């Protein structure tokens, strides 16, 4: 055979691992997928996993595989398994310090001895760091103890962890070297026929120096990844050349390691010191072995034994320098409550907290029964309320349990659950001596953990998942779903976030599915106390239990309340405890039927009045907010001026006293537009007094009175009095009449509103026919009731419709009208004559128009008069009786003066007649334009005004035609005109002061008068208004008087023939005007103005 030469690459293992890592990172050639409980997946190579451990081979045979996805058990979390898999590919273990216990436990379950030794080396490093951080304690001598290996057994030295890289345990060759002290455990492995190693036949066990874990990492130069030291690592020393060579030899030995490891240690004891970085973890760890510098002494020392029920606690401490051991023996066969045991230990021995040392705790049952449970070591924190445990924030007691294969122990997660929930339930699994079956986790957090299969089943249920947990995979991160704590929040999340449509048959609170809508509402009412707005459920009056239907309630009554269902309503089958309750129910809900059947009687109210007093009062208070104020249109209401209120003070006081005796009512005055009218107290009293005096047939003026219901106190008082008296309610006669009047006024208001335009047209037609009929009525006897009623109704309509709002609008229009009047006054006498004739037309038209038009005409006349007259009238009601006495004397004096004046001006009048005849159409057009401007400025109704203009034009044409005739009757009527001049001066001035015609007393307005007297009165009003204008216009005195007299004579022609009724009509006009008039500042004691005297 030829010579065989072997050539190898020293770093082939590193290169091979890097290639595998690249495939792993790119998920190339991966033939197995690990799926965890949080739905995260990890793709791996079966060959790599099988080369490191047999655990996954066993797992594939025992666990479920779905589409090449191996469903991992609940105990193996992704955050623990992923670092271990990365370690298999890279040889670097990257983990957080708080994950140490979980990694150690998982490595034991997987039986990965290399990983266990790596973690053990990291623990020793942390132990050394903690010793350096405590200067008072002596520095320990580190020595590495070597076991007795068999021939060809290489000893391993492990590579430390790096925070970034994925880790792998590196086999270490055995070389002869000086021995260094270290506290560690010997790890050996059997190389089952490893022929590849050149050192396989070595018979000498070489001892090598052991350097700190981080120094080994710095000596690892062949790895491409940068090495980073741990934050807790001590200051590293420079590696010596000898250590570098040793590490190179160890690299060559990696490929010589066999696939099977054996743990020859009879008992694996370990412990770990915690700091505040991971002091709160529930990680498991072993107790550290006793330092080898001090020889193990025989169990001597003090033992303290206490009996606590059936549990015996023994504190064993061989020497003061050694860590004490606590042995707990339980003589009972019940499950051990480890929380209570540790709490009792800390209470009995509080001094063990001060030493800050690990303490061995062995829990042993007294019975020699073979144990069937095994658990990993655990650490325990002392309670936070222990005063001795609060000496330092980071110096906490950690009690480690010594693993005893013959005794059942507690797991860390079980300990955490028991310490939090104070429950002694512990569940552990596993067959002793095997690590294939993992222990079950029973902590509170573990109970919420589910595998991926269950998770997908819950997610598929969607809103029908009534048990929880409620998970949403779409909103999760990296394949991990989010958990929503409640079903209601989960349902809202699906609707609002994912726009899903939920079955309406599902309960929105718990997801319970109902058959129909009524059943769903009943479920929500019973289970979630949500009252239904659609359905009412039958309730048992005896036990207050609700039922979905009346049939179920009846069945319940028949079964449960067989002897109690005597008080049952015969109409609705409702059951009551007492007979009185049944009677009230029948009286409230079945009164008509009960009265017909004779079950109840009206006289029974007398006996129930005293019993129901309090309940009815409470019922009235509850029902009172539902009784809102009733709106009733009472009648035609006018707003009085403050000057005329004092006349009726006595009547108002009397009415006020009567109102106080009656039930008090809150009165609100609302206009036609719906807004409340603000009035003074005197105005409110005046309106109320008018309402009491009005007739049922009076027309409505558009003002609404709102009468709210009486207050609860008055209702309660009346109810109490009437119930005690046992009599029915009785009303005052005044209340009955007022209600009847209000009802009639409502009907009349509706009728008048509907026929408002029709009545306006009727008024105009009546005004036209009145002049033609006046001549016939003067020669005949006055006809009886019907003409009188027509005239009185028309007068009421003309004088009643006058509101404050219209006057406000008229006052606003006065400045513009005054400017127009001043311009007309500065012109030639011709415009003056036109203006006077226009005023005459307006005065005539005021008698023939409807209520709205009359108001607008009066406002236009008042505006012109106010511009010419600089003196304001002062109201004086007390002077009215004197005016009435002097009117006759003033009329005689003015008549004599007027005759002389008329004779002097007769020639001038004749000269002006022809001028007036020729220019008569011009004032007609001017008056029409001026009237239209006044109508536009005020509120006005357009349709009615157009008809009024047409009729007024016809009247003007007739007056102009009659003005051409000789004034034969001028002397006859002159005395009557002079007699009323004084009163008309005051009446026009009162119109400037906005004194409404409604101040005329009701008795005077109701007096029946002949039709002839009414016609004469209207004509005299027109003539006196014209005479007023003639007297006040000084520059054109003569022309004003003559032009005003001619149309006036023609309009009053019919009234002059009725000589028998003239005296009565003059007195009537005086009585009407005396109440309107106010005294001017220039009037004398007889009520005659200075301007009138000067003209006369």
Curated annotation (Swiss-Prot):
Gene3D superfamilies hit by this protein: Classic Zinc Finger, Potassium Channel Kv1.1, Chain A
Region (Disordered): 126-308, 366-449, 608-630, 710-733, 770-927, 960-1096
Spans annotated as Involved in microtubule and centrosome binding: 1-209
Pfam families tied to this protein: BTB
Stretches the record annotates as Centrosomal targeting M domain involved in interaction with ZIPIC: 245-468
Chain intervals for the UniProt region annotation (Involved in interaction with cliff): 210-245, 309-390
Compositional bias annotation for Low complexity: 292-305, 412-445
Protein name (record): Centrosome-associated zinc finger protein Cp190
Organismal lineage: Eukaryota, Metazoa, Ecdysozoa, Arthropoda, Hexapoda
Gene from which this protein is expressed: Cp190
